[in-house]
Amino acid sequence: MCWKKIASWFKPDPVTPVAKRALLFGINDYKSIENDLDGCLNDVDDNEKKLTAMGFVCSVFKDSEVTCSTFYNEVKAALLSMRPDDFLYIGYSGHGTTIRSNHEPDGYCEALYLFDGPFTDDRMMELQQMTPAGAIVDAKFDSCFSGGMAKNPVKNRYYQMPGVPKVRKKVKRIAKSESQWVIFAGCSEEQTSADATFNGRANGAFTFYDLKCFGLGVSFADEITKIKTHLPGHGFDQAPELLGKTELFTYKY
């Protein structure tokens, strides 16, 4: 048998990056803290349904699947597979927090509080630097990085780290102007993101109304304008923010 001849025609299938991909992460049931949430898994399910209808290929991670290593590795793999003009949607619903840091003037940095602990803005910035030129990343964080109290009957999506005073932060360090990431923050710096109930079903307030605002042909700028109208109009004291390069805000889904 001529192995050389066989090798000449046997070639592995090329790995073709997905033009529109979504990574969706949600945590209701936390491993080591008592203040679990109610609407994060519904947020993920609802986003998956809508994004799939829009032509996205979705990967979903829930509760114990949303570890720091899984989040990092999944986002990294998706970024490294991207080509110019590819679109990656990253959705996170869960707690945010603040931790002590030597990198910030005030001594604290923001973090997503994942199933096994905080995922800091430093690690997120590592991922940003892997984004290929010309690719677009839309990252939505339905969480908060401030320690304010939410009014009943809603919960707030903030976890107060032991030994850390209440400080007010937002995702400013992971929204650098030179980045190809466009970031939707669920609330402004002095507010909290609500984990609420709509018609007997739990959702994040930001996600619930965001799903009504984005779709094919809608720009990021139009989306944030609509959300800012919906939330206060329905009694929620939170003003989502759009962060990143302003020239990317006109990009349409």
What are these regions (language model features)?
Residues 2-253:
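Cysteine endopeptidase catalytic domains of the caspase/legumain-like
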